[in-house]
A protein has these predicted regions:
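Acyl-donor (CoA/ACP) binding surface of acyl/acetyltransferases
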Residues: 2-26, 30, 72-198
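Generic structural signal for secondary-structure transition and capping sites
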Residues: 24, 35-36, 63-64, 124
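Hydrophobic residues in alpha-helical segments
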Residues: 31, 40, 58-59
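Conserved GNAT-fold acetyl-CoA-binding loop/helix
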Residues: 35-53
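Short, hydrophobic secondary-structure boundary micro-motifs
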Residues: 38-40, 67, 180
Length: 198
């Protein structure tokens, strides 16, 4: 099944498309780029064999879903759902923008809105959650603007650059999303973006 979000905002066209075989090398390059790796849990250069195992495992894993983010037809990042739990109606999510050229354009905010709408509207889930390195302040603050609440602080949860690093756990409930949705929708449309799933 392919789920695409393709809209024509005044400024930029953003699409989330399913990962394909043609993305194999691109995703490895992105995962190993310093800009992306700095905020991932892994702290080593990912080799081809390790990456191929991860990539090949995507297709048969019903608890995960991956998309490539495109801006104006150019692949610029990746978004995913993980720990998809249909019984408890919850899942985790993450994304990264590998291309510095799209940072500051509101792309991350658009992806956040898209994912929330997809999880609560399309999937009908009750909870969306994520984990973010405490040092990645701009991302966890973006989540909080969208209504995510801090549910945990995992101290010394991972090792980054040889030192323990703290991780923030955040969650958003479907019942809490309507209180934030209108304001966040207005911010996106003010930037010239069409709302996803509208």
């Amino acid at each position: 099944m392919t789920t695409q979000a393709s809209h024509a905002p005044l400024l930029h066209k953003i699409v989330l498309r399913d990962v394909t075989e043609g993305d194999r090398q691109r995703l490895l390059d992105w995962r190993n780029s310093p800009e992306v790796a700095a905020f991932m849990y892994s702290d080593h250069k990912i080799g081809q064999a390790e990456h191929d195992r991860w990539f090949d495992g995507m297709a048969g894993d019903a608890r995960r879903r991956y998309w490539v983010i495109e801006v104006d037809g150019e692949p610029v990042g990746q978004a995913n759902l993980a720990d998809i739990d249909t019984r408890n109606r919850r899942c985790a999510w993450a994304y990264y923008l590998a291309s510095p050229s799209v940072r500051g354009l509101g792309v991350g905010s658009y992806i956040e809105f898209w994912m929330i709408e997809y999880v609560f509207g399309t999937l009908g889930f009750d909870k969306l959650w994520c984990e973010v390195l405490l040092s990645n302040e701009s991302v966890w603050k973006l989540h909080e603007r969208y209504g995510f609440q801090r549910e945990a602080l995992f101290r010394h949860h991972v090792v980054k650059d040889g030192a323990p690093a703290d991780v923030v756990g955040l969650g958003l409930l479907a019942q809490d999303w309507p209180a934030r949705r209108e304001e966040m929708a207005q911010r996106l449309t003010a930037k010239g973006y069409a709302l996803p799933f509208a």
